[in-house]
Amino acid sequence: MSDTTKMELFTARVCPYAHRTRLVLLEKGLDFELIEVDLQNKPERFLQVSAYGKVPALVHDGVEIYESAIINEYLDEVFPEPSLMPRDPRLRAQARIWIDYCDGHFLSDHYAALKNQDQAKNAAWKDKIDAHLRRIDQGMRDLSPDGPYWLGPSASLLDFAYYPFFERLPAWAHYRDLGLPDDCTRIRGWLTVMAERPSVRAIANPPDYYIERYARYAAAPAAAE
């Protein structure tokens, strides 16, 4: 890659959003420089690229982009092979709806449940997270009953948007008993297939890594801000 098209990804190993974009870059077979950001001591150049001070952030051909969902669509448009979004505009819309559900609903509750310090509310949070997971499971069945991916036989940006959070689920199970309900069999089958993808295997972390890194989230709400 020439200097004019050099690609840099600002990331943090622990971050599920950055994990998404790393998966897409690997799926595309793209060359890029990985810049690990200390989230407790963010470098000035990173803050110049990422207006929100969050990872991931991408620099490519003079363009600075942040927010994982936006970065991933950019990558799929600029580097169209292999395509990670369906050609059917109706399915593309469904993919975006479910990615928005992940970012705007599922994850906000997921992290709130992890940071909850009131044991009297644990059961209510568990019910809420289980409801999210069952909704996701049903959404997978509705879009592609046989899978193995969200939208059918091929992986898409939708799969890579969700997978990093499921890889981190052991931390939620460890601290708040928030695991995958037994009846979410569509998700279980999807996870098995996703875990075997070379891109996923290349950057996977063991459960103990996430349990250790998410301890501060589970300890107290203020510590995780």
Task: Briefly describe each language-model feature range.
Residues 1-151, 218-224:
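GST-like domain detector, emphasizing the conserved glutathione-binding G-site
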Residues 152-176, 180-189, 194:
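GST superfamily/GST-like fold recognition
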Residues 197, 202-203:
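A late-sequence structural motif
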Residues 206-225:
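Acidic/histidine-enriched, glycine/proline-rich intrinsically disordered or flexible terminal extensions
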